[in-house]
A protein has these predicted regions:
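Acidic, small-residue rich beta-repeat scaffolds with periodic aromatic anchors
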Residues: 18-19, 25-93, 186-269
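Beta-propeller blade signature
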Residues: 139-149, 194-202
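Short consensus segments that form the blades of beta-propeller domains
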Residues: 99-101, 130-138, 156, 184-189, ...
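Acidic/hydrophobic-patterned starts of short beta strands in beta-sheet-rich repeat architectures
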Residues: 113-127, 169-184, 233-247
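Blade-edge beta-strand/turn elements of extracellular beta-propeller
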Residues: 150-158, 202-209
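Repeat-based blade/solenoid architectures
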Residues: 90-109, 156-165, 213-228
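Eukaryote-skewed repeat-based solenoidal scaffolds used as protein-protein interaction platforms
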Residues: 158, 162-165, 172-194
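Bacterial N-terminal signal peptides that target proteins for export
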Residues: 3-14
């Protein structure tokens, strides 16, 4: 091998060593070694079809739970008093609850530590179904009841949230959060809102209100109908700090196979 060929081989070898070394050497910023930035993790993608799979709750459990949460309630809608007068009170739904004119049912159940670290608890999502509740009232209020064994720890209104879509512990403090949604259909337009909620200390705390996360007007068949949906992602989880949450919004036509395109960041307008 002549000198020119040997020099060319050495040059190529040096370039290869430099290339592979760069794959393993961490960047240094301000005298400190930094790790490559990790991509955001998806907390929930509302573009995906959601299948409701609520847990089956034995009738005996339902009766026990509802009996602890409500002093009086009805077992059937047919027993509602059609002459119930709540027009004189500022909150007709509260008037119905106070009168025992409710037909409650358990929508879902979850287990975890919801009010305090290390406590084993069962959370029940309840549809109160006040007898006078209309479509405008989302057919009644929704509540969460949390039990530790037989002890009722919390009984709080959840602002019409009717579904649990994910249980998390984002800051690793041992207290679980819930991503909850509420939906409504009006004139063929489906609207869904979401919030990340916790019940620390037996009180409701809204960690993040995401606002509208789904707006689908396809069923209305109006000109220009479309489907809009949000993707909620989070920065790297570094306990005990709550990760930063980010909303990205997408839109698609009304075809069966959706082709989503990015439209905005932040809460959907």
């Amino acid at each position: 091998m002549n000198n020119n060929s040997r020099n060319e081989c050495l040059r190529i070898l040096a370039l290869l060593v430099l290339f592979f070394s760069s794959l393993f050497i961490q960047p240094v910023i301000g005298g400190q070694i930094t790790s490559p930035k990790k991509p955001n993790q998806v907390l929930f993608d509302f573009r995906l079809n959601q299948t409701s799979n609520p847990s089956r709750i034995p009738l005996s459990t339902q009766r026990r739970v509802l009996g602890r949460v409500f002093r009086r309630y009805l077992s059937d809608e047919s027993k509602c008093n059609p002459q119930l007068e709540t027009g004189s009170v500022s909150d007709p739904l509260k008037g119905a609850r106070d009168a025992g004119q409710i037909v409650p049912s358990i929508l879902d159940v979850a287990t975890g530590s919801f009010t305090a670290t290390g406590r084993t608890e069962t959370l029940y999502l309840i549809s109160v179904s006040e007898c006078n509740a209309s479509h405008a009232d989302n057919f009644g209020t929704k509540r969460v009841a949390i039990f530790a064994g037989e002890q009722l720890i919390a009984n709080v209104d959840v602002d019409f949230k009717s579904a649990i879509v994910r249980k998390t512990d984002l800051n690793g403090d041992g207290v679980d959060e819930l991503l909850m949604t509420a939906g409504d259909i009006h004139q063929g337009i489906l609207t869904e809102v979401a919030a990340l909620i916790e019940f620390r200390g037996a009180r409701l705390h809204v960690i993040e209100d995401f606002g509208v996360v789904t707006e689908d007007s396809c069923a209305s068949e109006m000109p220009g109908s479309s489907a809009k949906a949000s993707v909620v992602s989070m920065s790297e989880v570094m306990p005990p700090t709550m990760p930063k949450l980010r909303i990205q919004n997408y839109e698609a036509g009304c075809r069966k196979t959706k082709r989503w395109r990015f439209i905005s960041n932040g809460k959907m307008q």
